[in-house]
């Protein structure tokens, strides 16, 4: 019988942990405050991003933190990148801002590399600056370091459910900069044997069928895409596999969500499985809060975060 890897307990415990640290930060005269930059004016992306941001804001406000939203998508396209770079520079130096989140995906005419090179690594709550990315290769501490939210959230779920990745054959489907790519590096650091599959990979079913752990982060469900769609079903996996579903897309017309993983068929064979709703999403939100606490200590000390209490 499948064990559901739910994110609610991790989310609740992380918020409780964060509230304790908010009180500790008061000794430094610091209140965690997240600045959120929205640059993408695509109607579908904008609607989705606003929903994501509202959930993140609710979490942060619930621990006693603050959130400020900057709607840069209202700037003309030709001025948006410059406006973002200037704002990031100002926020980097603002003592009352302890974390900065540039919501992805960015519009195609904004240079992502320039944006994240300008962002201070001390306030980078998504772990996307070059300096913070280096930590994935040189070694990381799951409790002390600023790490990409979804990959770190997944690893925290594994820890909570006592899923050991050492020596396991792990397939990561998708090589995106937010999930697939950083997660594959982090898993290798934890001594997993990792295979990354992408749009040009041949015979993806073969690799998935032989994997102990499958993490699917594609977001191209066949219900919405005819070009290179992806759906993980039960006939793809071996008996007893661990399956984590990350990818999903909303139908712009019906507003219905479609996901990478077919829950019903996969649940019949998997030993552990994340639900499409209430799984990785909650873990991602929890990690964002944790990262904000870490960056808040960094801002408070301007040196490095103290050793934080493990959950």
From Swiss-Prot:
Which Gene Ontology terms describe the biological processes this protein takes part in? L-histidine biosynthetic process; methionine biosynthetic process; purine nucleotide biosynthetic process; tetrahydrofolate interconversion
A Pfam family annotated for this chain is THF_DHG_CYH_C
Q: Which GO terms describe its cellular component?
A: cytosol
Q: What is its EC number?
A: 1.5.1.5, 3.5.4.9
Molecular-function annotations in GO: methenyltetrahydrofolate cyclohydrolase activity; methylenetetrahydrofolate dehydrogenase (NADP+) activity
Top-level taxon of the source organism: Archaea
- Alphabetically ordered keywords of this record: Amino-acid biosynthesis, Histidine biosynthesis, Hydrolase, Methionine biosynthesis, Multifunctional enzyme, NADP, One-carbon metabolism, Oxidoreductase, Purine biosynthesis
The chemistry this enzyme catalyses reads: (6R)-5,10-methylene-5,6,7,8-tetrahydrofolate + NADP(+) = (6R)-5,10-methenyltetrahydrofolate + NADPH; (6R)-5,10-methenyltetrahydrofolate + H2O = (6R)-10-formyltetrahydrofolate + H(+)
Q: Its annotated pathway?
A: One-carbon metabolism; tetrahydrofolate interconversion
User: InterPro entries in the record, alphabetically?
Assistant: Aminoacid_DH-like_N_sf, NAD(P)-bd_dom_sf, THF_DH/CycHdrlase, THF_DH/CycHdrlase_cat_dom, THF_DH/CycHdrlase_NAD-bd_dom
Q: Which HAMAP family match?
A: THF_DHG_CYH
Q: What is stated as this protein's family in its record?
A: Belongs to the tetrahydrofolate dehydrogenase/cyclohydrolase family.
User: Subunit structure of this entry?
Assistant: Homodimer.
Q: What does this protein do?
A: Catalyzes the oxidation of 5,10-methylenetetrahydrofolate to 5,10-methenyltetrahydrofolate and then the hydrolysis of 5,10-methenyltetrahydrofolate to 10-formyltetrahydrofolate.
User: This protein is called what?
Assistant: Bifunctional protein FolD
Which organism does this record belong to? Pyrobaculum islandicum (strain DSM 4184 / JCM 9189 / GEO3)
Q: Which gene encodes it?
A: folD
């Amino acid at each position: 019988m499948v064990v559901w890897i739910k994110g609610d307990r991790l989310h609740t415990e992380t918020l409780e942990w964060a509230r304790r640290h908010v009180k500790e930060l008061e000794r430094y005269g610091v209140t965690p405050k997240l600045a959120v930059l929205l640059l993408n004016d695509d109607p579908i992306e904008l609607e989705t991003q606003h929903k994501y941001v509202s959930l993140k804001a609710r979490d942060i406000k619930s621990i006693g933190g603050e959130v400020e939203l900057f709607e840069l998508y209202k700037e003309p396209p030709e001025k948006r990148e410059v406006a973002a770079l200037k704002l990031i520079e100002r926020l980097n130096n603002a003592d009352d801002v302890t974390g900065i989140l540039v919501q992805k995906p960015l519009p195609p005419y904004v240079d992502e590399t320039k944006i994240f090179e300008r962002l201070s690594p001390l306030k980078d709550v998504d772990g996307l600056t070059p300096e913070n990315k280096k930590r994935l290769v040189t070694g990381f501490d799951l409790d002390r370091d600023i790490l990409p939210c979804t990959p770190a959230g997944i690893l925290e779920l594994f820890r909570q459910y006592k899923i050991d990745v050492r020596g396991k054959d792990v397939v990561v489907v998708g090589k995106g900069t937010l999930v697939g790519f950083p997660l594959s590096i982090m898993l290798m650091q934890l001594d997993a044997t990792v295979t990354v599959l992408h749009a040009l990979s041949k015979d993806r079913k073969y690799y998935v069928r032989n994997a102990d752990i499958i993490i699917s982060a594609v977001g191209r469900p066949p219900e919405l895409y005819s070009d290179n769609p992806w759906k993980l079903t039960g006939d793809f996996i071996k008996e007893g596999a661990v399956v984590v579903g990350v990818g999903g897309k909303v139908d712009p017309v019906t507003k219905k969500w479609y996901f990478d993983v077919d829950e019903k068929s996969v649940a019949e064979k998997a030993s552990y499985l994340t639900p499409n709703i209430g799984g990785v999403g909650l873990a991602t939100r929890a990690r964002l809060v944790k990262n904000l606490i870490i960056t808040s200590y960094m801002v408070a000390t301007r040196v490095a975060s103290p050793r934080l209490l493990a959950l």
